[in-house]
């Protein structure tokens, strides 16, 4: 599902927010963010290829660069400057767009919510074990899915992303949707593990960057966020101790105002009309909501 352009009377004057969802999700993930940005904002939340109502002339992508190619129409639709927001696998794609020479000049800000960029951890000895365990999980899921053990694969996938948080039973409808899209997971993992030189690319960014992590998330993504914050000049990192990996949805009431303010500040720095509903709050601590 696409959350298409929100009503705007200033054609060509505003930047556009492009929000990318997590694995096994859809663009509907961002309905609360659209509401937070307000009726004066432009937001596009596409379904990634293989999810929801997406369409692409390519086969399922095996690299993040191919994911970006599938989003070319969306990026063209945005027209001008872009604010990227991405969660989990969508965060990895957002990062790839922001560091792509074809698009980097159009990116005005970047918000990453626990992006899945595991090769970043391969570059560090102490973090290598997190990378290797995630690679083992990817191999197990691929074997399960290819062998027809889809339910087992979904259970392993959801258990991993629960991190240290409570295990909650998935609603039947959500479980069915995940089963229907399970094959896509193997491509998501392949694309994430194919991305190289993440540290160098991250250090090259010269735009406002906002990073989120949750204290109950897997150590993998918590460490990825910390590593990115360490190499991205001036990155604003926010840690929510009581949040899990799905904080983009479970803690939307906390993080969406921060994202909105981040986007507004980036537009102000660029001397452009605000892409959001004129919010300019300086939110500092998210520890307890």
Summary of predicted features, one role per range:
Residues 234-289:
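Catalytic active-site module of serine/aspartate enzymes centered on a nucleophile-bearing elbow/loop
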Residues 20-22, 88, 214:
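Glycine-rich His-Gly loop
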Residues 146-186:
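Conserved alpha/beta-hydrolase catalytic His-Asp/Glu region
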Residues 174-230, 239:
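Conserved serine/cysteine hydrolase catalytic core
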Residues 35, 44-85, 89, 96-100, ...:
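Active-site loop/oxyanion-hole signature of alpha/beta-hydrolase fold enzymes
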Residues 6-56, 80:
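Conserved HGGG/HGGXW glycine-rich cap/lid loop of the alpha/beta-hydrolase fold
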Residues 99-100, 104-144:
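Flexible "cap/lid" loop of the alpha/beta hydrolase fold
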Residues 30-31, 54-60, 121-124, 222-223:
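Conserved catalytic-core motifs of eukaryotic protein kinase domains, centered on the activation segment
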């Amino acid at each position: 599902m696409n959350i298409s352009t929100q009503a705007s009377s200033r054609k060509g004057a505003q930047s556009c927010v492009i929000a990318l969802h997590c694995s096994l999700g859809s663009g509907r993930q961002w309905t609360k963010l659209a509401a937070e940005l307000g009726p004066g904002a432009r937001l596009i939340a596409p379904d990634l290829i293989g999810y929801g109502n997406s369409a692409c002339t390519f086969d399922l992508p095996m690299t993040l660069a191919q994911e970006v190619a599938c989003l070319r129409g969306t990026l063209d639709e945005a027209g001008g400057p872009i604010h990227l927001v991405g969660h989990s696998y969508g965060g990895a794609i957002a990062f790839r767009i922001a560091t792509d020479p074809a698009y980097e000049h159009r990116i005005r800000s970047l918000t990453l919510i626990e992006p899945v960029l595991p090769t970043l951890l391969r570059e560090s000895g102490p973090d290598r074990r997190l990378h290797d365990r995630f690679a083992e999980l990817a191999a197990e899921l691929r074997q399960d899915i290819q062998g027809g053990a889809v339910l087992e694969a979904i259970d392993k996938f959801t258990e991993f992303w629960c991190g240290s948080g409570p295990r909650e039973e998935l609603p039947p409808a959500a479980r069915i949707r995940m089963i229907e899209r399970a094959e896509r997971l193997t491509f998501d993992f392949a694309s994430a593990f194919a991305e190289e030189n993440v540290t160098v690319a991250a250090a090259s960014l010269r735009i406002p960057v906002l990073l989120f992590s949750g204290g109950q998330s897997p150590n993998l993504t918590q460490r990825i966020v910390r590593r990115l914050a360490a190499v991205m000049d001036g990155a604003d990192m926010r840690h929510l101790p009581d949040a899990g990996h799905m904080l983009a949805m479970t803690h939307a009431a906390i993080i969406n105002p921060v994202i909105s303010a981040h986007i507004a500040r980036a537009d102000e720095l660029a001397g452009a009309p605000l892409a959001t509903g004129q919010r300019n709050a300086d939110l500092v601590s998210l520890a307890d909501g």
